[in-house]
A protein has these predicted regions:
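Catalytic glycan-binding domains that act on GlcNAc-containing polysaccharides
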Residues: 1-180
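Short, intrinsically disordered, charge-balanced linker/junction segments flanking boundaries
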Residues: 184-190
Length: 190
């Protein structure tokens, strides 16, 4: 059903369809779960109360601009617990920068138009540095004495550092031959 959109997105952005579909599945169960909280009122509240008022104030005004443009009607603009909305869970400010009108109807609708959402996701990944042909990740075997405090996406190190700590690709390749760019900072996700 979405093959043409995904193939066109791959040609334009270099992001393989499987990755875009994986994001869609993780973020909203393929559009089935897109949020249950009214976006504008929730962002308005968060912009006045709490620890991240400045951040949510920017998101609040971005949501108002989305509604003003008519891309999405207010009755359909709901968000998840984390503040994102639509098929692939964009924050309003991210939507403003990266959403695309794939079908050419004049609206960037990530709530009711899966084609716009999938194309926007590919654009988001490309603009975020996606490199076509590069692996996004691979399974690594770690030594029994590996310190789990070193794991996590915030603890990025060159593959050579992980190799020095005993990491080896499960398929037997050394991390140096894993397809990662030399000096690329990577993270171990457990």
């Amino acid at each position: 059903e979405h093959r043409a959109v995904l193939q066109k997105g791959e040609a334009a952005d270099g992001v393989d369809p499987a990755t875009v579909v994986a994001v869609w599945g993780v973020e909203s169960n393929y559009g089935r779960i897109t949020g249950k909280y009214p976006l504008v009122s929730a962002l308005g509240t968060l912009s006045c109360f709490g620890r991240r008022q400045d951040y949510f104030r920017g998101e609040f005004f971005a949501a108002l601009r989305i509604l003003q443009r008519g891309d999405i009607v207010p009755e359909r603009l709901y968000w998840s617990w984390a503040g994102a909305f639509g098929h692939t869970q964009f924050m309003p400010a991210t939507y403003e920068r990266l959403a695309v009108d794939f079908d050419g109807d004049g609206r960037r609708d990530l709530v009711d138009n899966s084609a716009d959402a999938l194309a926007s996701t590919a654009n988001f990944l490309r603009r975020g540095g996606w490199q076509s042909g590069q692996p996004w990740g691979f399974e690594v075997r770690l030594p029994a004495a590996f310190d789990p405090a070193l794991a996590g996406r915030r603890n990025k190190r060159p593959a050579s550092d992980w190799a020095a700590r005993g990491g080896v690709a499960v398929d037997g390749r050394t991390l140096a031959n894993s397809g990662l760019a030399d000096g690329e900072r990577t993270a171990i996700l457990l």
